[in-house]
Design a protein with these regions (language model features):
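Short beta->alpha connector loops
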Residues: 85, 108-110, 171-173, 196-198, ...
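Structural alpha-helical scaffold elements that stabilize or flank donor/cofactor-binding regions
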Residues: 118, 183, 326-329
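Internal gly/pro-rich beta-alpha loop/helix module
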Residues: 123-124, 129-228
Length: 404
């Protein structure tokens, strides 16, 4: 699992590194070198391919400028595009000028014509305009910067698209919560220094980030254990999966029961059943209204079907008892309620009857409430205390707002 940090945590880590003997300059050089290495690999180590670096006035821009100088030493021909003129006493800027590599300044670029030209020539665009200190919620990108980022994003419409690499975080994204300016850079990859920032994993910002590449810049390793947030990657989940014994059979891997379905939404419960079977459950049982059984059984020969009694187009009052008996008979380990169930007075009573009867069924390892079951929950008084079995809920923002 990878540790992720907030802006304040990152600033604190950098401060700790400096206190322990690492200079701010050393941290910048490490970041700039890492950025240059990623840029070099992105263009396939072909110096003739254009590398455009967009340089802002802050620390993020400094990292980009150091990367430009390093690329020059390796034989590349970078083009630096400055958001505004830099201090003539800046050593990195002096070094770049002395290399006689090309550059332009946005404030001197009439109608951004020079930018348009180099954007179309570039195989790689490095976004080093703004870093993690930028908060677009409080201070949106200004008109001039927005014009630059819009044109960067428009290169995605080119026949031959350049690769867009952002340093630490794409310009226009809040590093803590993923809030995104309408004109934020849409990166193909983001190299993030020290630890990945929380906003890289939060939507809507996540859509603009691309591949996340954390790199070490020499922060103290003894502080890692105090960082509370971390990601869980799909590849890492395999370590949590129990090994399947060679003598296993369907009874080894437990029973999943899925409750839901209606005339309007017969497909939802079928998809859930198919997913449960593919995920490795030993046995899958679907409890759905009897009048849609034919729609579900076709194509699912490996699933057990428990028809729920109906009156007309609605579930019968005895449907909940049928579900509970099915749970008992198969000693269900995992119960999913909700896919395609529908939201009516009848289904509300149905879900309530099931939920309030689960605590005495010790064989249940967990209950998942999804879709229409989540819409029904707010109508059930003290639902969270009535359900003692371990619970997983899967609300989208609208459903979550009703639950709260």
């Amino acid at each position: 699992m990878k540790k992720i940090v907030t802006t304040k945590q990152m600033q604190s880590l950098e401060s700790d590194a400096i206190t322990s003997g690492k200079s701010e300059r050393e941290l910048q050089l490490e970041a700039g070198l890492a950025a240059a290495q990623e840029a070099w690999m992105s263009v396939g180590a072909m110096p003739e391919r254009g590398i455009l670096l967009l340089i802002g006035p802050g620390k993020n821009g400094k990292d980009g400028l150091i990367a430009a100088n390093q690329l020059t030493k390796w034989g590349a021909t970078p083009f630096v595009y400055l958001l505004r003129e830099l201090n003539i006493d800046d050593d990195d800027w002096k070094e770049y000028q002395e290399s006689e590599m090309p550059y332009a300044i946005a404030t001197e670029d009439t109608e951004l014509q020079r930018l348009e030209f180099v954007l179309n020539e570039a195989a790689l665009i490095v976004d080093a305009l703004l870093g993690i200190g930028m908060d677009p919620e409080i201070r949106p990108l200004d008109e001039n910067l927005s014009e630059i980022t819009k044109r960067v994003n428009q290169t995605k419409e080119n026949i031959v698209k350049p690769h867009i690499l952002s340093l630490d975080i794409p310009t226009g994204i809040n590093a803590d919560n993923g809030y995104t300016d309408p004109n934020a850079v849409k990166a193909d990859s983001t190299i993030t220094f020290g630890y990945a920032k929380m906003g890289l994993y939060c939507f809507p910002g996540r859509e603009n980030v691309g591949r996340i590449i954390p790199v070490d810049i020499g922060l103290p390793s003894n502080t890692r254990h105090i960082l509370p947030y971390e990601t869980l990657e799909l590849s890492e989940l395999k370590a949590f999966m129990p090994e399947r014994p060679i003598t296993a059979h369907k009874g080894t891997f437990g029973v999943v029961t899925i409750v839901g379905g209606s005339l309007q939404y017969p497909g939802a419960i079928r998809l859930a059943g198919e997913a449960a079977a593919r995920s490795g459950a030993g046995l899958v049982q679907i409890a759905a209204p009897d009048h849609i059984q034919a729609l579900i059984t076709n194509g699912l020969p490996d699933v057990i079907h428990e028809p729920l009694p109906t009156t007309g187009n609605s579930l019968d009052t005895s449907a909940a008892i049928t579900v509970l008996r099915a749970l008992d008979k198969k000693k269900t380990r995992a119960l999913l309620i909700g896919p395609g169930l529908g939201h009516t007075a009848v289904t509300t009573k149905f879900v309530h009857s099931i939920i309030t009867s689960l605590s005495e069924r010790n064989f249940l390892n967990g209950v998942i409430l999804d879709a229409d079951a989540l819409n029904i929950l707010p109508e059930i008084q003290n639902w969270s205390t009535n359900l003692q079995t371990p619970l997983i809920i899967t609300p989208h923002p609208g459903e979550m707002s009703r639950l709260l």
